[in-house]
Curated annotation (Swiss-Prot):
One of its GO terms (cellular component) is nucleus. The active site is at residue 502. The lineage of its organism: Eukaryota, Metazoa, Chordata, Craniata, Vertebrata. Residues 25-57 are annotated as: Interaction with NPM1. It comes from the Eukaryota. It is found in: Nucleus, Nucleolus; Nucleus. Its EC number is 2.1.1.-. S-adenosyl-L-methionine-dependent methyltransferase that specifically methylates the C(5) position of cytosine 4447 in 28S rRNA. Required for efficient rRNA processing and 60S ribosomal subunit biogenesis. Regulates pre-rRNA processing through non-catalytic complex formation with box C/D snoRNAs and facilitates the recruitment of U3 and U8 snoRNAs to pre-90S ribosomal particles and their stable assembly into snoRNP complexes. May play a role in the regulation of the cell cycle and the increased nucleolar activity that is associated with the cell proliferation. This is 28S rRNA (cytosine-C(5))-methyltransferase. PANTHER family: 28S RRNA (CYTOSINE(4447)-C(5))-METHYLTRANSFERASE-RELATED, NOP2 YEAST -RELATED NOL1/NOP2/FMU SUN DOMAIN-CONTAINING. Its main location: nucleus. It catalyses: a cytidine in 28S rRNA + S-adenosyl-L-methionine = a 5-methylcytidine in 28S rRNA + S-adenosyl-L-homocysteine + H(+).
Length: 793
């Protein structure tokens, strides 16, 4: 920019007033080279002497530089880009005094960086520091007193040969200049390190049983870590490396104390982990809990695609990769130059910060479109939004949580992510079947002890005990049974339940699942996840259902995600099995248990007798026999047909189950006479309640009159006693005789008075032991009071 300078019109100027004229190399180098008889000459090596001789020879015949007159570089000033030389010294050329007073054109005054490295005059323009000590008087006047003293000290050191020069740099190349006592301190330090290494490599010796650690002193973590490695090595080959007289329990006890000290765990949780993992895997698990898990994102496919989201975040300075082949929407973040939870994409709802293990339960649930799904413990809403994402905002999702404060985060996340098919509720999950049920699928992320997320919450290491584990397990059992009751087994597309926890203890996982298999009509099905370790079917003294192999466990040291447990159930019946199978309504329809079926008891609480069982069996046989064209009706325990006379059903059944055969033909004749008299009476009477059912306080001669008539369903389910087999033939014969007598027309049967019913030898209730015995007096009185009404008008 600006006007171009015309070099022809530039005035020529000579050297400055303070410019120092540099003398030849023969005078400049003499000051630094020692004299021939000087003692300091012995300090120079052979190579240094050769280089000094070359300088002396070169300083005698120095060719005159081919340089334009008038150019002179001021000492103490360097052109832009030039570096003052510290290595090899080059003798300055002898300058002509006549040329010092002449000056070249303006273009020659400018020295570029390319001229310094590529031009032939670069050595001539370079300023050396050989004459730094011989400053002019004007320069010394500008220096401070302390600077003058420093210059004098430097000059004295130069004369003594201590000044830095290139000969000092060549001492490492010479073998003659190294003294044997050059590095005494380094040798001592190396010897000390070697001694420490020798001490560390000593064999591990288990301390005596009664000896304890020194109180009041902080443990040396390096020694503790070394001892842990030694104990693990001994336990791997215990038979060969153990000390004589020491048991495995002593080594394990010492290892537990060292692990608790080194990793800051409580004794209870560490003992649980030692029961769960082998020793080598235990160390890996403890080390993995000291490192945080990688940050993972879940793409919200309701608003964007994973490819587009990844490109936007990469442009913002986020280093990320796809989460894995098992996930189509996950991204893992390695590092970021922007806060990953405050980007415009996050605020717009394009992604959700969610752990990798939290995506697995929703993938195992596999929700379908247009379904009714329940998320029983939904806060903070990550799994709920993922379910809505897979359902494409169709169907209905009921998101429930017992903590009202945590529901605020659920509302915020669902609004931000654009979820529109979710209803939020605040109920206790244990009472949820009373609120609403009939869901196609249910997801239960039960509250747990959090032993799988120690990297997020290190306080779990010390603040958990046996009571906390048992309390969580009891709550999980209640929630799981409630969730199973909320599932509809008759769903065409569903009937599934996924149970998951962020804990790795057996008490909160396999134990709870095995309990649910015994209490409800469910079975375990595969989760559909291609990776993960199988659940335990046996753990120490416990034995679980073999189908627990289909459950999945995830650990931080093997899968690089939070510890998790996932189980998937399929409900095949909405009924609830009971421990006592007496209730027919609660019995399982698929597998009815008839062996434990109990016959109904009598009203007075006594056990049913053989005769009562025979009566039930006879009634069952009567129901199976083909009846006549005219149907029979049952009213108040009396089977009647229109225009026909009948007798009470229970006494007939009792008569048919007589164990003896002494009556013979006499019983048949008495029956015929009795039936003929009943035909002549006309309208039938209805016995009162007092006559039908005797009071418990007044014992009746009719022993089985108080036995209630069982229902048809109970009759079908009742077992057949073996002792009633011979009496069934008699019952069939007598029943046929009754039907033949009943089919005879009743001509001229005049109705009698009600009082006449109690009189006469043929009473409606007959004792099973004697067919001619009259009824008791109390029953006769109750029947004559006029309470009974005729059955036929």
């Amino acid at each position: 920019m600006g006007r171009k300078l015309d070099p022809t019109k530039k005035e020529k100027r000579g050297p400055g007033r303070k410019a120092r004229k540099q003398k030849g190399a023969e005078t400049e180098l003499v000051r630094f080279l020692p004299a021939a008889g000087d003692e300091n000459s012995k300090r120079l090596s052979s190579r240094a002497r050769k280089r000094a001789a070359k300088r002396r020879a070169g300083s005698v015949d120095v060719p005159k530089p081919n340089k334009s007159p008038g150019i002179k570089t001021l000492p103490g000033e360097l052109s832009k880009g030039a570096v003052q030389a510290r290595g090899k010294k080059r003798p300055a050329p002898i300058q002509n005094s006549d040329g010092d007073e002449e000056e070249d054109s303006g273009e020659d005054d400018v020295v570029t960086q390319g001229d310094l490295w590529g031009s032939e005059d670069s050595d001539e323009d370079m300023v050396d520091d050989y004459g730094a000590a011989s400053n002019s008087e004007d320069e010394e006047e500008k220096l401070l007193p302390i600077e003058r003293a420093a210059l004098k000290q430097k000059a004295q050191d130069a004369t003594a040969g201590v000044l830095w020069n290139e000969e000092d740099t060549d001492e490492d190349e010479d073998d003659d200049g190294v003294s044997p006592e050059s590095h005494p301190r380094k040798d001592d330090k190396a010897e000390g390190d070697l001694q420490i290494n020798v001490e560390d490599e000593e064999a591990f010796v288990l301390p005596p049983a009664g000896e304890t650690d020194q109180d009041g002193q902080a443990p040396d973590l390096q020694r503790v870590h070394k001892r842990i490695q030694d104990i693990v090595g001994v336990l791997r080959d215990f038979g060969a490396q153990r000390e004589e007289g020491r048991s495995r329990a002593e080594y394990l006890s010492r290892l537990q104390k060292d692990l608790a000290t080194y990793y800051s765990y409580g004794d209870f949780l560490l003992s649980k982990l030692m029961e769960l993992f082998p020793l080598s895997e235990l160390i890996e698990f403890l080390e993995a809990n000291e490192v945080p898990r990688p940050i993972t994102l879940r793409t919200n496919t309701l608003k964007t695609r994973r490819r587009d989201l990844a490109q936007l975040l990469i442009n913002r300075g986020v280093n990320l990769d796809p989460l894995g082949k098992w996930s189509k929407s996950g991204l893992v973040v390695y590092d970021s130059s922007v806060p990953i939870g405050a980007t415009p994409e996050y605020l717009a709802g394009h992604y959700m910060l969610q752990g990798a293990s939290s995506m697995l339960p929703v993938m195992a649930l596999a929700p379908q479109e247009h379904e009714r799904i329940l998320d029983m413990c939904c806060a903070p809403g990550g799994k709920t939004s993922y379910i809505a994402q897979l359902m494409k905002n169709t169907g209905v999702i009921l998101a429930n949580d017992a903590n009202a404060d945590r529901l605020k985060s659920v509302v915020g996340n669902l609004h931000r992510l654009g979820v529109t098919n979710t209803i939020i509720s605040h109920y206790d999950g244990r009472q949820f079947p009373k609120v609403v049920g009939g869901f196609d699928r249910v997801l239960l992320d039960a509250p747990c002890s959090g032993t799988g997320v120690i990297s997020k919450d290190p306080a779990v290491k010390t603040n958990k005990d046996e009571k906390d584990i048992q309390r969580c397990a009891h709550l999980q059992k209640e929630l799981l049974l409630s969730a199973i009751d909320s599932v509809n087994a008759a769903s065409k597309t569903g009937g599934y339940l996924v149970y998951c926890t962020c804990s790795i203890t057996v008490e909160e996982n396999e134990w709870v699942v095995d309990y649910a298999l015994k209490k409800r009509n469910v079975r375990l099905v595969p989760t559909g996840l291609d990776f993960g370790q199988e659940g335990f079917t046996r753990f120490q003294a416990r034995r679980f259902h073999p189908t627990l192999r289909s459950t999945r466990r995830f650990y931080p040291h093997t899968h690089n995600m939070d510890g998790f447990f996932i189980a998937k159930f399929k409900k095949f019946s909405n009924s609830i099995p009971q421990p006592h199978a007496g209730n027919s309504a609660a019995a399982t329809p698929t597998e009815p248990d008839l062996k434990d079926q109990v016959t109904p008891k009598s009203e007075n609480g006594s056990q049913p007798t053989k005769k009562a069982r025979g009566a039930v069996k006879a009634k069952q046989q009567l129901l199976r026999q083909p009846h006549s064209k005219k149907p029979f009706q049952k009213l108040n325990g009396i089977a009647k047909g229109p225009g026909l006379s009948t007798e009470p059903s229970v006494p007939d059944a009792q008569v048919s189950t007589r164990p003896s055969q002494s009556a013979g033909n006499a019983d048949v004749n008495s029956k015929r006479k009795r039936s003929e008299k009943l035909k002549q009476r006309g309208p039938k009477w209805k016995p009162s309640k007092e006559a039908a059912v005797p009071k418990p306080s007044a014992p009746s001669r009719v022993e089985d009159s108080g036995t209630p008539v069982p229902t048809p369903s109970e009759i079908r389910a009742a077992p057949r006693p073996k002792d009633c087999a011979p009496s069934l033939g008699k019952a069939k014969k007598k029943q046929k005789g009754k039907q033949q007598l009943a089919q005879q027309p009743a001509n001229g049967a005049a109705p009698l008075k009600e009082d006449a019913v109690s009189k006469g030898p043929s009473a409606p209730f007959v004792s099973p032991h004697s067919s001619t015995r009259p009824p008791p007096a109390k029953r006769r009185k109750s029947m004559t009071k006029g309470n009974s009404q005729p059955l036929l008008s």
